[in-house]
Curated annotation (Swiss-Prot):
GO terms for cellular component: cytosol. Pfam families: Iron_traffic (PF04362). Belongs to the Fe(2+)-trafficking protein family. The keyword Iron applies. One of its GO terms (molecular function) is iron ion binding. The keyword Iron applies. NCBIfam families: PRK05408.1 (NF003817). Keywords: Iron. GO terms for biological process: cellular response to oxidative stress. This is Probable Fe(2+)-trafficking protein. Could be a mediator in iron transactions between iron acquisition and iron-requiring processes, such as synthesis and/or repair of Fe-S clusters in biosynthetic enzymes. InterPro entries: Fe_traffick_prot_YggX, Fe_traffick_prot_YggX_sf.
């Protein structure tokens, strides 16, 4: 049986993550307040950020940038802005 959380990103009850995917207090906050669906949305944006900005995950500054973007996306409702990216038309 899956657990449900009130997802602050989607503003609704939804299936929660199966386990804590991120370390520390932020990871606990994500586990308690973010749904699988919202986490999937973040993973998509994260991949775009890493690729388009050519981030190196071995660089502590790049990891901090990604963490800041993640917090903004998941908890503050900020969308990830990638210069020059045009979403495909539907």
């Amino acid at each position: 049986m899956s657990r449900t959380v009130f997802c602050v990103r989607l503003n609704k009850e939804a299936d929660g993550l199966d386990f804590q995917l991120y370390p520390g207090e932020l990871g606990k906050r994500i586990f308690d307040n973010i749904s699988k669906e919202a986490w999937g949305q973040w993973q998509h944006k994260q991949t775009m950020l890493i690729n388009e900005k050519k981030l190196n995950m071995m660089d502590p500054e790049h990891r901090k940038l990604l963490e800041t973007e993640m917090e903004g996306f998941l908890f503050d409702g900020k969308d990830v802005v990638i210069d020059g990216y045009t979403p495909p038309s539907e």
